């Protein structure tokens, strides 16, 4: 059985036992998180209002920061060059089960 969940403005396909990185969530490592399912698949497909009855239980594994990316700006002819970096915060969660 798998489910589609939405958190941080993104959708993820998850199954029991998966560890995924999502946008930063509240809570310490070891805390339990409950997410609503948008779609449930497997032996029987459930979506729409019926999928709202299903919940996905997850546990916070860790908080961290992603790999650094660099953004460069350049304008020709005027010697304008800028480089900035960015590291996105994330939360790793482990999917414990899909219930509904």
From Swiss-Prot:
The keyword RNA-binding appears for this protein: yes
InterPro entries (UniProt xref): bL21-like, bL21-like_sf, Ribosomal_bL21
Entries under Pfam families matching the protein: Ribosomal_L21p
One Gene Ontology term from the biological process aspect of the record: translation
One term under GO cellular component: ribonucleoprotein complex
Keywords (A to Z) from UniProt: Ribonucleoprotein, Ribosomal protein, RNA-binding, rRNA-binding
Record bears the keyword tRNA-binding: no
GO molecular function terms attached to this record: rRNA binding; structural constituent of ribosome
Organism superkingdom: Bacteria
Annotated family: Belongs to the bacterial ribosomal protein bL21 family.
Subunit structure and binding partners: Part of the 50S ribosomal subunit. Contacts proteins L15 and L20.
Role this protein plays: Binds directly to 23S rRNA, probably serving to organize its structure.
Protein name in the entry: Large ribosomal subunit protein bL21
């Amino acid at each position: 059985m798998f489910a589609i969940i939405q958190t941080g403005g993104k959708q993820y396909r998850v199954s029991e036992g998966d560890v995924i990185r999502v946008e930063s969530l509240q809570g310490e490592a070891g805390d339990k998180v409950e997410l609503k399912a948008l779609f449930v698949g497997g032996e029987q497909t459930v979506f729409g209002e019926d999928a709202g009855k299903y919940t996905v239980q997850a546990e916070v594994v860790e908080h961290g920061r992603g790999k650094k990316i660099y953004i460069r700006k350049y304008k020709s002819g005027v010697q304008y060059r800028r480089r900035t970096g960015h590291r996105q915060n994330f939360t790793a969660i482990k999917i414990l089960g899909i219930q509904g």
